[in-house]
């Protein structure tokens, strides 16, 4: 279906024809744990990866399969794996690349949960991380070590929507024989396709824009199919005979889908962060309206940013669409159709004023999620990034008066009126 536009692909990929068993137009929910094999030879072929298809519900499901094919197509990848959450998608990706003493070079301005995962949790599994200013390409390249196994970025940093130069960083990573991993949760494939700029693996918290309605947890790993795992010589679990799967080389068995096949067959098999068929179904409902929602998110965000930038009670707005933002040129390069509907601003005052502003909003919901059709707000320093030290918060540009907004699809007049009520409470 590659000849079709994004808006058509988001509706049809993975189910080009009605369901063969029922003729249903909507993707059915295949609520089953297991699958019947035709005979013993068929079962052996499935387990040997010589016949593609369902083996067991922890690994695959037909509803999940449609979601995976659709997201792979939308991102321009070869294959995808859907898992139980965005955190699982990121964890599996890093573990697959860097287990047993590997090292990651990561952008420092990332989601607090991902920062904590890399800085603390994964160290117990022998994985270390150096956090760098992704705008300083020399610093990033100098951080690469002999045991480095990947470079990790976000298309739009969390929470300040800063933007790395993906093309330039991809060139550095590839020159050192490393894959570039990009979290495109905030970007979405509708606004930016990182694979077209050199990314090798793209991850998502599908809980956010992909689902879009604050109802469903899920994560996605998309394999570009472009990285040469054998040539690099750094990934024997993927490229060489793997003793955990009766000597299979995933490169030989799965070709360009080797990376996600390895995660599915080994990590997902053994640790089981499986997405439920129902969650896969709900995320598919979100995918079908992705472009429509993102257009409205972008339209509303532009107007909110303009409003905040002129407000006398606002100290600073961190949004790359503003001409004085340090990433404005990168924003115009990578996001020509707008975006960055999750961003921060600094209210005049401190933490007390920030909390009072938030507590007097009515339409904006105070919660930890983002990228919902409903507008959302939170105080990062005391919530999503509260695990960080004072020094780490400062390093990531998060201050006591920083407020994060996630702009929804409500009528813009109501959104701005609600923000005005928050400001009125602290006059």
Predicted segments with their positions:
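N-terminal "arm"/small-domain region of PLP-dependent enzymes with the aminotransferase-like
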Residues: 2-61, 69-70
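Short hydrophobic/aromatic beta-strand micro-patches
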Residues: 222, 344-346, 406-408
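Active-site beta-loop-alpha junctions enriched in small/polar residues
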Residues: 156, 185-187, 322, 348, ...
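Conserved N-terminal alpha-helix of the aminotransferase class I/II PLP-enzyme fold
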Residues: 39-91, 113-120
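Conserved small-domain helix->loop->beta segment predominantly found in fold-type I
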Residues: 271-274, 278-280, 285, 289, ...
């Amino acid at each position: 279906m590659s000849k079709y536009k994004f808006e058509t692909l988001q509706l049809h990929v993975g189910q080009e024809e009605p369901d063969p068993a029922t003729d249903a137009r909507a993707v059915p929910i295949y609520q089953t744990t297991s699958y019947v094999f035709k005979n013993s030879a068929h079962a052996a072929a499935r387990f040997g990866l010589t016949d593609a298809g369902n083996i067991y519900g922890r690994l695959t499901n037909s509803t999940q399969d449609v979601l995976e094919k659709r997201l792979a197509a939308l991102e321009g990848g070869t294959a995808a794996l859907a898992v139980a959450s965005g955190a699982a998608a990121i964890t599996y990706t890093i573990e697959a690349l860097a287990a047993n003493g590997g090292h990651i070079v990561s952008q420092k301005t990332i989601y607090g949960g991902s920062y904590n995962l890399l800085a603390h949790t994964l160290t117990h599994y022998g994985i270390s991380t150096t956090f760098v200013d992704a705008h300083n390409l020399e610093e990033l390249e100098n951080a690469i070590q002999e045991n480095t196994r990947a470079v990790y970025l976000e298309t739009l940093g969390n929470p300040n929507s800063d933007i790395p130069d993906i093309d330039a960083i991809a060139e550095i990573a590839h020159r050192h024989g490393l894959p570039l991993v990009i979290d495109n949760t905030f970007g979405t494939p509708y606004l930016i396709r990182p694979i077209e700029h050199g990314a090798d693996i793209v991850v998502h918290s599908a809980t956010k824009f992909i689902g879009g309605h604050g109802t469903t947890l899920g994560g996605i790993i998309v394999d570009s199919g472009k990285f040469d795992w054998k040539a690099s010589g750094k990934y024997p679990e993927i490229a060489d005979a793997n003793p955990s799967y009766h000597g299979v080389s995933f490169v030989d068995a799965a070709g360009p889908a080797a990376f996600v096949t390895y995660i599915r067959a080994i990590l997902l098999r053994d640790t089981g962060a499986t997405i439920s068929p129902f969650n896969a179904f709900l995320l598919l409902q979100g995918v079908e309206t992705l472009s429509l929602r993102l257009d409205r998110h972008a339209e509303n965000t532009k107007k909110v940013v303009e409003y905040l930038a002129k407000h006398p009670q606002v100290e600073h707005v961190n949004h790359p669409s503003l001409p004085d933002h340090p990433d404005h040129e990168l924003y115009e390069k990578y996001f020509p159709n707008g975006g960055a509907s999750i961003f921060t601003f600094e209210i005049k005052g401190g933490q007390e004023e920030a909390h009072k502003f938030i507590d007097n909003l009515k339409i904006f919901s105070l919660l930890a999620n983002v990228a919902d059709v409903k507008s959302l707000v939170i105080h990062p320093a005391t919530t999503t990034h509260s695990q960080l030290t004072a020094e780490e918060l400062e390093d990531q540009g998060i201050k006591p008066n920083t407020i994060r907004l996630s702009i929804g699809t409500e009528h813009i007049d109501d959104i701005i009126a609600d923000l005005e009520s928050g400001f009125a409470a602290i006059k």
